[in-house]
């Protein structure tokens, strides 16, 4: 048996799919949540923020009270706080959170909207959440947390990632830190160093909000002389608080807290650990932290007038630079003392922790063709960006000292020196930083110093004066700061002595007189090369000695800690024995008191029995008295009756 189907039947499912899509497009938020059941939240995952908000329905436009939970990257809402199954959820990364201005008739409504990231722009309005908070403060808190989880900038400046802000503002000129931070710091240094309670007293909230909106709108407002200094300080703190990730990244929060804990035991060790933590910061974060610490150091120099010492500034600013990812009051209270100590050290010792030699001024990208570079004026000093990976500090110093102009080849390197340089691996990954540190190029007079011919190199072997060992967790970075500083000073003295002898005492060869770029004789260069190689060996030996010194100091520290632990152990054992003895005495006393109490109870029971017996005896005596009274009355009556009979 065969089944015949009509010829006009259409098996195309596109029409049905379009009908389903149209029917879904007019669903309300609750219906969409039912159509796409929300993912079950992980109960073990700690919520970032919870609270009651009013949610506007999609079609009817009325408000419904819902309990919202911000957990991980999802925003859930429930009908009741006790419910375990959410009515809906939204995936926040890439979403947009914006505040909605209300009409004057709707005063008292604090409305904001969460728009999910979607390629279908026609359905954004259907999927967005329009929410209303009970107060302005609550709305700002929700907006801040939602924007932080969404990872999108809230505006041109506030709430934007630090690296994005710095990269964007390079079109206005080279800036190490955001323009907002520069303008606020310059204004405070000019008008606020003598202001009492700077950074501690709040500014005008409405003016702070106006300035924030102006910066977010792309404007660059300038502060006039009448602007309140406390308002500018509050604006700076607000910018630091609104960063999606703090200046000290969340991944290094525990490391900085550890530095604060080590300061109680060994401040030198804490400083070394802090140097390691600073070396792993992103370049933009390091520049901003360095700028702020130097700026705060200038503020505290006038602490006799403004009443803001290093400790006070560290307390009010540290929580804005170093904060936990989960803003739990218990976590904040636990980390506040350590943050205050670390911030105090960074402000007080900023010259050691943030040396100016580590500052890398930002310049426009270098031209690919070096021949097109503008010539540097004679007898002038400039800074040129290095493009190659940095080498060791000794290599970079020797090569830079040998050739003031790294781009001018004067001949091949000697074979032994070339092998020595090629055998040394770079200590730092060039990809770790967007911009390498800068080298100093110097144009000298016509007479070249003999250091010029000591080491010749090509364009591919550009070197820098100072190797950024500060940024790499190498063994030399573990040495004491004083040792490194002495090394660098000795090298600078050596370089100055060599340069002076070149200008004054070294005769030029005929080749150098005929050609300003010529080199001196090979014997002079060989002797100078030997001197520099010996300097390299001395520096390596110094680094080894410093490593041994660090090991010895570490061993001594461990031994002292072990002794301290043994002493504390003995003290604790003595205390435990004393407590056990006191506990036994108390227990014996309790037993004795219990026995006495039992005896008192028995005595009390016996007294009660005696009292009852006395009561019974008294009752018996009273009964006998009443009986005797009756008998006496009867006897008296019987005696009176015979007398009456005898009278007649």
Curated annotation (Swiss-Prot):
Rho-GAP domain boundaries: 160-354
Pfam families registered for this protein in UniProt: PH, RhoGAP
Signal peptide from the UniProt entry: none
GO molecular-function terms, A-Z: GTPase activator activity
List of residues that carry Phosphoserine: 363, 396, 403, 537
UniProt keywords, alphabetically: Coiled coil, GTPase activation, Phosphoprotein
CDD domains xrefs: PH_RhoGap25-like, RhoGAP_ARHGAP22_24_25
UniProt-annotated site: Arginine finger, residues: 200
Listed GO CC annotations: phagocytic cup
Sequence ranges of Polar residues compositional bias: 393-410, 453-462, 497-515
Entry-linked PANTHER family: RHO GTPASE-ACTIVATING PROTEIN 25, SPERMATHECAL PHYSIOLOGY VARIANT
Role of this protein: GTPase activator for the Rho-type GTPases by converting them to an inactive GDP-bound state.
Name under which the protein is recorded: Rho GTPase-activating protein 25
Gene name per UniProt: Arhgap25
């Amino acid at each position: 048996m065969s089944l015949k189907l009509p010829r006009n039947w259409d098996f195309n499912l596109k029409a049905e799919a379009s009908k389903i899509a149209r029917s879904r497009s007019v669903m309300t938020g609750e219906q969409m949540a039912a159509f796409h059941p929300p993912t079950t939240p992980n109960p073990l995952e700690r919520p970032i923020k919870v609270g009651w908000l009013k949610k506007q329905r999609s079609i009817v436009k009325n408000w419904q009270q819902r309990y919202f939970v911000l957990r991980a990257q999802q925003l859930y809402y429930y009908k009741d706080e006790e419910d375990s199954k959410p009515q809906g959820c939204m995936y926040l990364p890439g979403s947009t959170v914006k505040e909605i201005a209300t009409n004057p008739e709707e005063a008292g409504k604090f409305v904001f909207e969460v728009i999910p990231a979607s390629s279908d722009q026609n359905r954004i309005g259907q999927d967005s959440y329009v929410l209303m908070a009970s107060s302005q403060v609550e709305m700002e808190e929700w907006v801040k947390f939602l924007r932080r989880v969404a990872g999108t900038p809230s505006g041109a400046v506030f709430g934007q990632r630090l690296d994005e802000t710095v990269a964007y503002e390079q079109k206005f000129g080279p800036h190490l830190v955001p323009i907002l931070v520069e303008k606020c710091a310059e204004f405070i240094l000019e008008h606020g160093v003598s202001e009492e309670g700077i950074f501690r007293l709040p500014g005008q909230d409405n003016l702070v909000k106006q300035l924030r909106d102006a910066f977010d709108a792309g404007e660059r407002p300038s502060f006039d002389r009448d602007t309140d200094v406390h308002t500018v300080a509050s604006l700076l703190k607000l910018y630091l608080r609104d960063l999606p990730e703090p200046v000290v990244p969340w991944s290094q929060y525990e490391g900085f807290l550890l530095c604060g804990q080590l300061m109680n035991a060994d401040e030198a060790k804490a400083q070394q650990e802090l140097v390691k933590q600073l070396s792993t910061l992103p370049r933009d974060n390091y520049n901003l932290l360095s700028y702020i610490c130097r700026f705060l150091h200038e503020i505290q120099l006038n602490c006799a007038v403004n009443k803001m010492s290093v400790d006070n500034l560290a307390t009010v600013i540290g929580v804005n630079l170093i904060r936990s990812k989960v803003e739990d009051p218990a976590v904040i209270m636990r980390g506040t003392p350590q943050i205050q100590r670390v911030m105090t050290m960074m402000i007080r010792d900023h010259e050691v922790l943030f040396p100016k030699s580590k500052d890398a001024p930002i310049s426009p990208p270098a031209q690919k063709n070096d021949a097109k570079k503008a010539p540097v004026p004679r007898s002038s000093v400039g800074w040129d960006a290095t493009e190659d990976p940095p080498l060791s500090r000794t290599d970079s110093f020797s090569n830079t000292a040998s050739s003031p102009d790294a781009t001018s080849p004067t001949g091949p390197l000697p074979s032994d020196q070339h092998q020595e340089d090629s055998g040394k691996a770079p200590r730092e990954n060039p990809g770790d930083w967007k911009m390498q540190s800068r080298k100093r190029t110097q144009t000298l007079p016509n007479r070249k110093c003999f250091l010029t011919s000591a080491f010749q190199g090509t364009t591919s072997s550009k070197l820098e004066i100072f190797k950024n060992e500060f940024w790499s967790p190498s063994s030399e970075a573990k040495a004491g700061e004083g040792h490194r500083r002495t090394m660098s000073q000795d090298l600078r003295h050596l370089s100055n002595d060599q340069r002076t002898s070149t200008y004054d005492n070294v005769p030029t060869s005929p080749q150098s007189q005929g050609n300003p770029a010529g080199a001196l004789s090979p014997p002079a260069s060989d002797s100078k090369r030997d001197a520099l190689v010996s300097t390299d060996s001395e520096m390596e030996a110094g680094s080894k000695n410093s490593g041994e010194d660090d090991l010895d100091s570490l061993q001594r520290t461990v031994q002292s800690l072990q002794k301290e632990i043994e002493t504390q152990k003995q003290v604790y054992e003595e205390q435990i024995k004393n407590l056990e003895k006191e506990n036994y005495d108390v227990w014996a006393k309790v037993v004795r008191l219990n026995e006495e109490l039992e005896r008192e109870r028995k005595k009390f029971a016996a007294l009660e029995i005696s009292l009852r017996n006395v009561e019974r005896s008294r009752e018996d005596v009273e009964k006998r008295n009443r009986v005797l009274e009756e008998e006496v009355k009867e006897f008296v009556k019987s005696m009176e009756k015979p007398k009456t009979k005898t009278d007649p």
